[in-house]
Amino acid sequence: MTVRVLQTGLHPERVDFDAPEFKRFEGLTEDKLRQANDDNVAMLREAGFDVVNVLIRNGDTPEDVVRKAMEQGPFDALLIGAGVRLVADNTLLFEGLVNLLHAAYPNARFVFNQAAETSPDDINRWFEGPEVKAPLQ
């Protein structure tokens, strides 16, 4: 069976690229974020992972959007994007998503990528490839 990945993050329209908390992502624009997300999903699929990608838009209730995506589960690996994880103003969002996902998938592994292009390797920290369902200890 193929390792199933739920990747979630902020839709580019939801990000205020001029806000101080996003200044750490130097040079990031709506187009660059959209392309990075698309490239990340493509790389994961090319590496053999089964990926469901859900992006949280303006006006969305994040937990509801993720719950809807969870209907496509179960998932083995749960990847939450840097815009959620690394921005202090999104701490409650990050906490809520972690608790929601952990309650639904207590045996899944959370994967925090170092960069979009490293996601396949980051998932492989926990799995010995896309066809191995049992996570490494």
For the regions a language model picked out, list residue spans one by one:
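Acidic/glycine-enriched edge-of-secondary-structure segments
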Residues: 42-61
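Ser/Thr/Gly-rich flexible loops in soluble cytosolic domains mediating phosphotransfer, phosphorylation
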Residues: 36, 93-130
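The AdoMet/dcAdoMet-binding core of the Class I SAM-like
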Residues: 13, 31-35, 116
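N-terminal, charge-rich interaction modules
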Residues: 1-23
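Short catalytic helix/loop segments, enriched in acidic residues and glycine
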Residues: 23-42
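Short, glycine-/small-residue-rich phosphate/pyrophosphate-handling segment
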Residues: 24-25, 47, 53, 113-137
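Mid-chain, well-packed structural core segment of small domains
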Residues: 64-100
